[in-house]
Curated annotation (Swiss-Prot):
The keyword Repeat applies. Changing Y28C: Abrogates the interaction with BRCA1; decreases double-stranded DNA break-initiated homologous recombination; reduces PALB2 and RAD51 localization to ionizing radiation-induced foci; may weaken homooligomerization. GO terms for cellular component: DNA repair complex; nuclear speck; nucleoplasm; nucleus; protein-containing complex. WD repeats lie at residues 854-915, 917-961, 962-1009, 1010-1052, 1058-1109, 1115-1153, 1155-1186. Residues 1-579 are annotated as: DNA-binding (with the preference D loop > dsDNA > ssDNA). Residues 9-41 form a coiled coil. This is Partner and localizer of BRCA2.
Length: 1186
C-alpha cells in the first residue's frame, strides 16, 4: 500500500501491515523448514550411500581369502539349523523368524556326473548362501572389531547357528557379498553367516547344474532358456516316489526398505538333490498370521519351520511349505512344538489320517478358497501378473500371486464349501500387498481402493496346510489366527513397477496409518459369490497395463508396467452380468475410482487366456448358478433418513446407508466425468460413457442432464440414494415436453404422488393471515369487483390438498421439496429438448398460453398514512407469550406493525417514525421475533436500523446497526443479517447474528470481492453458503462459517446488471433465479423477466436453462419482484403483477392494476400461498394463490 511520504498511517493501516508482515514471516518459516528438511534428507542419503560403499569394500576384502582357501569339494556340510531373522519395526519391536532345521546330513556330490560345480558370472565372488567348510568348523574368518559390533545387533542369540539378517540385506549389482562369524562359545557348531547382499539361489550347490543363474535388472531372476520347465503342483501330488529325488525351488531374497520381496526362481528339471531326509522345501509368498503371541511349529522329519508370531500377529515371512504337500501328513512329528499347539496338531492329524492321499488333503483345504475370497472383497480387484505353473501338464493362465492355476482352485472349491465359512482374506492381503509404501502415501487415493489380488488364494492354502486343517470343523483353530484388516494397495506411480514376481509384505504400523475395519461374514447365510465362477481367475485392473512375453519352453514372464489406463472409462459396461461388490464402512470417506459393476465379458477381454476354459461337464452347473445369483440380486434402494446398515435379503452383503447432502455435493461436483447409472432403476437408457468422455466441451446436457439415480465416476460401485428430498430437485429423465396438456399431466402426476400442502416446514404451524376463506363470497364482500380473480383458463382447476390424498399416500411433506423436484425435472426436460436441437443454452421462451392460475382476494389493509407506501412484509410477533402473524408496512416516514382482527379488519400495534432519512425497504430477518430491520436512505441505503419494542413499557425503539455507503442488505436464516458497504478500496461484507429475542449481536466479516455487490441471495439447501451478484455480471460465493470467498463465476453477458433472487443447491450444482431489470424488450422472445441458470461451482461453467417471459399481448419490463420456492412474482412497467410457476416455466397469473392505480411492490408472505401487493396510496391487498 503506497502512501505519500510524510503521511502518517492510520491504526487500521498499521494493523493491516502487521498482518501482512506476520503472514510473510509464517510463509518464510515454512519455506525455510522445507528447505532444511530437504538438505537433511540429502545429507542422510549421501551418508548412507557412502556407508554402503565402504561396507561393500570391506565385504569384498573379507570374502577374498575364503574363495582362495583350498577345501575338499566332495563333502558339504548342511548346517544343523538355518535361522532367518526378520526385524520388522524398530518402533514396535516386532520380530518374526523362520528356522529351517535340516539335519547334519552330508550329501556326496559324487552322485552327480560332474560333482558340485561352483558357478561364477562376471565378478560374482560366490553363489553359496553360506560358506563351505568342514563339519568341525576349523575354517574361521576373523572380522574387524567394528563389523563384529555391528553384527551383534542383528543376532537373536548365540545358540542359534546361522542368522540371515534381512535388515542388512544389500543389493549390489552383480556381486554377492557375504560375511561370517563363528561363535566363540560353540566352536564345534556351524559358523554364523550374515548375508548383506541379494541372496542368489541354492542352485550353485546342486549337482548337474551346468547352466549359471542369470541375474537381470537386480529385481527379477530368469532361468536360462535351456532350463527345463518346473513341474506343477499336480505333478508333485501324483508322483509316487518323491522323497529320493525332489526338486528344490530356488529363492532370491531382497530388501526394499519397507517390505520383503521373495522372488521365485524355477530350477532346472535335472537339478535333483539326492538325500533321504531333506524334504522338498518351497518358499512361495509371505503370509499374514495373527495368533496373539502364539507360536505354530510344523515339523516334517528333520524339517522345522518355526513361525515366531509377533505381538500384532503379522508375519511377512516365507510360508506355504510344500513339505506338507510332498510328503504324507501323518509323518508329522511334534518334538519342537509349543505345548499349547501340540495338542491341536495331534487332533487335527488324526482326522487327516483318514484321507487317502496328500492330494485329497490339499483338495479339502482349498475347497471354498476362491469363493470365500471373492465374497470378502469389499473393493474391485486389481490384476497384477501371471506366472508359469503346471506348464508341463496344462497351458493355463495363472494370476500373479497364485500358487496354482485358477483351475485348481475352482476344482477344489465345491468340496470345501461346507466347512470353511469365515475367511480372513483381508488379513492375508494385509501382509501380502502392504498398505502404503514410501512414496505412495495418499497421492492417488482414487485408485488405492483397488485391491491387488496377488497372493490371497496362496495364503489361504498355506494357512490351511500349515495348520493341517482338512475340511473338518477343526479348521476353526487356524481361522482364529487370522485377523481381518482393511487393505488398500499402492496404485500410484512407483519407482519400481515391475511387480511380476514380487509378493509385497509389510509389517503393521510401519507405513500404514489408515483405519482397520473388521468385516466378518456370517457363517450361516453367505451371499453367493459376487463374481461368476468362470471368471474367478480374472480380476479387474484400473491403473496398470499388463504386457506379457513368452520365452522358450513355455516360460512366461510378465511385467506390470505402471502406466495408467482407463479401461473403466473406455469400455462400456453391460448390466446383464454385473456383480455388486459390498462396501466397506469407510467407503465414502474420499472420492475413489472403483469399478463396482464388473462384466464377465469385459473381464475376459482384459486377459489373453491361452487354451484354458473350465470344462462345461464339470463346471457348467456351477457357472450357471453363479451367473444367475449375480444377475438376480439387485441392490435395494436406500430409504430416506435411515442410518446404519441393512442386509440384503439373499445374504449378508452390508451397505452403509448414511449419506449427507454435503457429501453428495462433494462427490457430484465434477460433472465433466462420466455418469454411470446403476441397473434396477427406472432408467430405460444409460449415458454412453465413452462418447461423453471424448467430449471436450461442456454442453448443457452434460451439465444438467443428470439422471435421477446416478453416481459419481469416482464412486462407481456405490448405489445412489433416494434420500430425503433435498432443497432443490434431483434431475430426472422424463421425456421432453409436448403441448400444454403434457405440462398439466406431468404436474398432476408428480403432485399425485406426493400431494403436499404448499407451505414451508418452519411455517407449517402458522395460521393463515385471514380466517377461513370459504366464508367470503362475492355477495358479502365489500371488495366485490376483485374478490375472486379467475385470471384465465378453467375456473374449476382443482388444487392439491390433503383431502385429495389417495389411500396409501404418505403424509404431507414440505411443499418446496416436491415442487422444486418438479422444477428440476421440468428443467431437465427442457434441457433434453434443447440438447436434441443442439443448442448450447436454453433461450427459448416458455409456452405462449397462460396456465390456469387462481388469485383470490382474502383481505385488504388500508394504511391512513399520508406518505407514499414503499414496502410490505409479513412476520411473526410475540405478544403475551403468543406468536401471531403480522404485517409490516413501510411508508417513507413511518413503519407500522399490523395485527389481523378478522379477514377485513386490521389493528395497528406499533409505529416507528423517521423524520430525517426516508425508509427505502423492509429487511426481515428470519427466525427472529419481535425485531425487524429497515433500510433508510434517498437513492442509496445510508442506514440500517433495528426496530423493536421495549419489554417494560411496550414503547417503540430503534437502534442503528450500520451506516455508510451500503450497497446491499439481506436477512438470512439463523438470525443473520448480511450487508455490503464501502467502495472498492475499503469494501466490507459484514454478517451480524442476533439472539432469538432480537437482543445482542455478533459481527463477522467476509472476504470482500474486488467488485461492487448489487444483491445477496441465500442458497437454499446449503445454509452456510451465500451468493452475491456484482456489477460486472459475476456471481461470488462465500463460506459463511469461515468467511472465505470461495469462487467468482461469470455469467452470460446477454443481460447486464442481473439481480439474483434465489439460489438452490443440489448435487454440487447451483440453480439461480435471476431477473433482468435492464433487459430490452424483444418481439421474438418478448420481454424476459426471470431466468433460471445453473452453474457448476467447481468449473465455474454456467448455462442458461429457461427464460420466463410475458405471454403474448403483454408488455413491460421488470421493475421489482420476489421469489418464493417455486413461484415468482414481478411488477412490470405497465403496472401489472405477473406470476410464474418455475416448475412449469409459464406465466400462470396476471393481476392488472386495481382502481386505475398501478402496483408499486409485491411480496410473498410466510407461505407461498399468500401474495402481498401494495399501491402507492398505502393500500395493501392480500391474495391467496393456488
Amino acid at each position: 500500500m503506497d502512501e505519500p511520504p510524510g503521511k502518517p498511517l492510520s491504526c487500521e493501516e498499521k494493523e493491516k501491515l502487521k498482518e501482512k508482515l506476520a503472514f510473510l514471516k509464517r510463509e518464510y518459516s515454512k519455506t525455510l523448514a522445507r528447505l532444511q528438511r530437504a538438505q537433511r534428507a540429502e545429507k542422510i542419503k549421501h551418508s548412507i550411500k557412502k556407508t554402503v560403499e565402504e561396507q561393500d569394500c570391506l565385504s569384498q576384502q573379507d570374502l577374498s581369502p575364503q574363495l582362495k582357501h583350498s577345501e575338499p569339494k566332495n563333502k558339504i556340510c548342511v548346517y544343523d539349523k538355518l535361522h532367518i531373522k526378520t526385524h520388522l519395526d524398530e518402533e514396535t519391536g516386532e520380530k518374526t523368524s523362520i528356522t529351517l532345521d535340516v539335519g547334519p546330513e552330508s550329501f556326496n556330490p559324487g552322485d552327480g556326473p560332474g560333482g558340485l560345480p561352483i558357478q561364477r558370472t562376471d565378478d560374482t565372488q560366490e553363489h553359496f548362501p553360506h560358506r563351505v567348510s568342514d563339519p568341525s568348523g576349523e575354517q574361521k574368518q576373523k572380522l574387524p572389531s567394528r563389523r563384529k559390533k555391528q553384527q551383534k545387533r542383528t543376532f537373536i542369540s548365540q545358540e542359534r547357528d546361522c542368522v540371515f539378517g534381512t535388515d542388512s540385506l544389500r543389493l549390489s549389482g552383480k556381486r554377492l557379498k557375504e560375511q561370517e562369524e563363528i561363535s566363540s562359545k560353540n566352536p564345534a557348531r556351524s559358523p554364523v553367516t550374515e548375508i548383506r547382499t541379494h541372496l542368489l539361489s541354492l542352485k550353485s550347490e546342486l549337482p548337474d547344474s551346468p547352466e549359471p543363474v542369470t541375474e537381470i535388472n537386480e529385481d527379477s531372476v530368469l532361468i536360462p532358456p535351456t532350463a527345463q520347465p518346473e513341474k506343477g503342483v499336480d505333478t508333485f501330488l501324483r508322483r509316487p516316489n518323491f522323497t529320493r529325488a525332489t526338486t528344490v525351488p530356488l529363492q532370491t531374497l531382497s530388501d526394499s526398505g519397507s517390505s520383503q520381496h521373495l522372488e521365485h526362481i524355477p530350477p532346472k528339471g535335472s537339478s535333483e538333490l539326492t538325500t533321504h531326509d531333506l524334504k522338498n522345501i518351497r518358499f512361495t509368498s509371505p503370509v499374514s498370521l495373527e495368533a496373539q503371541g502364539k507360536k505354530m511349529t510344523v515339523s516334517t522329519d528333520n524339517l522345522l519351520v518355526n513361525k515366531a508370531i509377533s505381538k500384532s500377529g503379522q508375519l511377512p515371512t516365507s510360508s506355504n511349505l510344500e513339505a506338507n504337500i510332498s510328503c504324507s501328513l501323518n509323518e508329522l512329528t511334534y518334538n519342537n512344538l509349543p505345548a499349547n499347539e501340540n495338542q491341536n496338531l495331534k487332533e487335527q492329524n488324526q482326522t487327516e489320517k483318514s484321507l487317502k492321499s496328500p492330494s485329497d488333503t490339499l483338495d479339502g483345504r482349498n475347497e471354498n478358497l476362491q469363493e470365500s475370497e471373492i465374497l470378502s472383497q469389499p473393493k474391485s480387484l486389481s490384476l497384477e501378473a501371471t506366472s508359469p505353473l503346471s506348464a508341463e501338464k496344462h497351458s493355463c493362465t495363472v494370476p500373479e500371486g497364485l500358487l496354482f492355476p485358477a483351475e485348481y482352485y475352482v476344482r477344489t472349491t465345491r468340496s470345501m464349501s461346507n466347512c470353511q465359512r469365515k475367511v480372513a482374506v483381508e488379513a492375508v492381503i494385509q501382509s501380502h500387498l502392504d498398505v502404503k509404501k514410501k512414496g505412495f502415501k495418499n497421492k492417488n487415493k482414487d485408485a488405492s481402493k483397488n485391491l491387488n489380488l496377488s497372493n490371497e488364494e496362496t495364503d489361504q492354502s498355506e494357512i490351511r496346510m500349515s495348520g493341517t486343517c482338512t475340511g473338518q470343523p477343526s479348521s476353526r483353530t487356524s481361522q482364529k489366527l487370522l485377523s481381518l484388516t482393511k487393505v488398500s494397495s499402492p496404485a500410484g506411480p512407483t519407482e519400481d513397477n515391475d511387480l511380476s514376481r514380487k509378493a509385497v509384505a509389510q509389517a503393521p504400523g510401519r507405513r500404514y496409518t489408515g483405519k482397520r475395519k473388521s468385516a466378518c461374514t456370517p457363517a450361516s447365510d453367505h451371499c453367493e459369490p459376487l463374481l461368476p465362477t468362470s471368471s474367478l481367475s480374472i480380476v479387474n485392473r484400473s491403473k496398470e497395463e499388463v504386457t506379457s512375453h513368452k520365452y522358450q519352453h513355455e516360460k512366461l514372464f510378465i511385467q506390470v508396467k505402471g502406466k495408467k489406463s482407463r479401461h473403466q472409462k473406455e469400455d462400456s459396461l453391460s448390466w446383464s452380468n454385473s456383480a455388486y461388490l459390498s462396501l466397506d464402512d469407510d467407503a465414502f470417506t474420499a472420492p475413489f475410482h472403483r469399478d463396482g459393476m464388473l462384466s464377465l465379458k469385459q473381464l475376459l477381454s482384459f486377459l489373453s487366456i491361452t487354451d484354458f476354459q473350465l470344462p462345461d461337464e464339470d463346471f457348467g452347473p456351477l457357472k450357471l448358478e453363479k451367473v444367475k445369483s449375480c444377475s438376480e440380486k439387485p441392490v435395494e434402494p436406500f430409504e430416506s433418513k435411515m442410518f446404519g446398515e441393512r442386509h440384503l435379503k439373499e445374504g449378508s452383503c452390508i451397505f452403509p446407508e448414511e449419506l449427507s447432502p454435503k457429501r453428495m455435493d462433494t462427490e457430484m461436483e465434477d460433472l465433466e466425468e462420466d455418469l454411470i447409472v446403476l441397473p434396477g432403476k427406472s432408467h430405460p437408457k444409460r449415458p454412453n460413457s465413452q462418447s461423453q468422455h471424448t467430449k471436450t466441451g461442456l454442453s448443457s446436457s452434460i451439465l444438467l442432464y443428470t439422471p435421477l439415480n446416478t453416481v459419481a465416476p469416482d464412486d462407481n460401485d456405490r448405489p445412489t440414494t433416494d434420500m430425503c428430498s433435498p432443497a432443490f430437485p434431483i434431475l430426472g429423465t422424463t421425456p421432453a415436453f409436448g403441448p400444454q396438456g403434457s405440462y398439466e399431466k406431468a404436474s398432476t402426476e408428480v403432485a399425485g404422488r406426493t400431494c403436499c400442502t404448499p407451505q414451508l416446514a418452519h411455517l407449517k404451524d402458522s395460521v393463515c393471515l385471514a380466517s377461513d376463506t370459504k366464508q367470503f363470497d362475492s355477495s358479502g364482500s365489500p371488495a366485490k369487483p376483485h374478490t375472486t380473480l379467475q385470471v384465465s383458463g378453467r375456473q374449476g382447476q382443482p388444487t392439491c390438498d390433503c383431502d385429495s390424498v389417495p389411500p396409501g399416500t404418505p403424509p404431507p411433506i414440505e411443499s418446496f421439496t416436491f415442487k422444486e423436484n418438479q422444477l428440476c425435472r421440468n428443467t431437465c426436460q427442457e434441457l433434453h429438448k434443447h440438447s436434441v436441437e443442439q443448442t448450447e443454452t436454453a433461450e427459448l421462451p416458455a409456452s405462449d398460453s397462460i396456465n390456469p392460475g387462481n388469485l383470490q382476494l382474502v383481505s385488504e389493509l388500508k394504511n391512513p398514512s399520508g406518505s407514499c407506501s414503499v414496502d410490505v412484509s409479513a412476520m411473526f410477533w410475540e405478544r403475551a407469550g403468543c406468536k401471531e402473524p403480522c404485517i409490516i408496512t413501510a411508508c417513507e416516514d413511518v413503519v407500522s406493525l399490523w395485527k389481523a382482527l378478522d379477514a377485513w379488519q386490521w389493528e395497528k400495534l406499533y409505529t416507528w417514525h423517521f423524520a430525517e432519512v426516508p425508509v427505502l425497504q423492509i429487511v426481515p430477518v428470519p427466525d427472529v421475533y419481535n425485531l425487524v430491520c429497515v433500510a433508510l436512505g434517498n437513492l442509496e441505503i445510508r442506514e440500517i436500523r433495528a426496530l423493536f419494542c421495549s419489554s417494560d413499557d411496550e414503547s417503540e425503539k430503534q437502534v442503528l446497526l450500520k451506516s455508510g455507503n451500503i450497497k446491499a442488505v439481506l436477512g438470512l436464516t439463523k438470525r443473520r443479517l448480511v450487508s455490503s458497504s464501502g467502495t472498492l478500496s475499503d469494501q466490507q461484507v459484514e454478517v451480524m447474528t442476533f439472539a432469538e429475542d432480537g437482543g445482542g449481536k455478533e459481527n463477522q466479516f467476509l472476504m470482500p470481492p474486488e467488485e461492487t455487490i448489487l444483491t445477496f441471495a441465500e442458497v437454499q439447501g446449503m445454509q452456510e453458503a451465500l451468493l452475491g451478484t456484482t456489477i460486472m455480471n459475476n456471481i461470488v460465493i462465500w463460506n459463511l462459517k469461515t468467511g472465505q470467498l470461495l469462487k467468482k463465476m461469470h455469467i452470460d453477458d446477454s443481460y447486464q446488471a442481473s439481480v439474483c433472487h434465489k439460489a438452490y443447491s443440489e448435487m454440487g450444482l447451483l440453480f439461480i433465479v435471476l431477473s433482468h431489470p435492464c433487459a430490452k424488450e424483444s418481439e421474438s422472445l418478448r420481454s424476459p423477466v426471470f431466468q433460471l441458470i445453473v452453474i457448476n461451482p467447481k468449473t465455474t461453467l454456467s448455462v442458461g436453462v429457461m427464460l420466463y417471459c410475458l405471454p403474448p399481448g403483454q408488455a413491460g419490463r421488470f421493475l421489482e419482484g420476489d421469489v418464493k420456492d417455486h413461484c415468482a412474482a414481478a411488477i412490470l412497467t405497465s403496472g401489472t403483477i405477473a406470476i410464474w410457476d418455475l416448475l412449469l416455466g409459464q406465466c400462470t397469473a396476471l393481476l392488472p392494476p386495481v382502481s386505475d392505480q398501478h402496483w408499486s411492490f409485491v411480496k410473498w408472505s410466510g407461505t407461498d400461498s399468500h401474495l402481498l401487493a401494495g399501491q402507492k396510496d398505502g393500500n395493501i391487498f392480500v391474495y391467496h394463490y393456488s
